[in-house]
Amino acid sequence: FELAKDAIDFLTDEKRIGRTNIITNKLQSKEIPLRVTHNDTKLSNILFDKNTDEAVCLIDLDTVMPGALAYDFGEGLRTGITTAKEDEQDVSKIHADINRFEAFTKGFLSEVKDIITEEELEMLPLGVWMMTYENAIRLIFSSSYTASELMELCQPEMFGIFNQHDCSIRYIDFNLYYC
């Protein structure tokens, strides 16, 4: 129970909660433009032509809504740079691949270069933090987990999925504050 409480305390820390409003406030004040965003940006939500490997279309459109470019960038990086599956239980298999990070960032920026504003560009790192944070919150408070399953996830030997989000948030927290 103590690890679950620690996870909840970590995620609901006042500094983290306060940071969740930054992008939303900039959207509301029109400092950054409202865009059509997918909000579940990942490779498995793109259909490819089996002969040419060209992207044909996006799927999972139930998540499309007005939002910030930072959300799509953040979710794409969150899911795209890890060397493990999103639901990997073995923490030793969870690593960030710098080459994937560079390729995704370069590709994303090349596609939005004609529309992205300076303010939006500044929000991209926060978008990575925000989407990682949001998914960690979903994991901890998801109704798909029973109390006993949540306790299992929070056992040191079963830390897998939560640890991926927790470590990502701690890493991004560190970089946003100190780098």
Feature names for model-found ranges:
Residues F1-A4, E88-S92, E118-E122, L150-Q155:
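Short, surface-exposed loop/turn segments at secondary-structure junctions
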Residues F1-H38, L43, L47-C57, M151:
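ATP-dependent phospho-/nucleotidyl transfer catalytic cores
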Residues R19-K26, L61, T79-T82, S110, ...:
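Conserved helix-loop functional segments at active or binding sites
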Residues A70-K113, M130-E149:
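Active-site activation/catalytic loop segments of kinase-like enzymes and analogous catalytic loops
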Residues F108-L126:
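Hydrophobic alpha-helical bundle architecture
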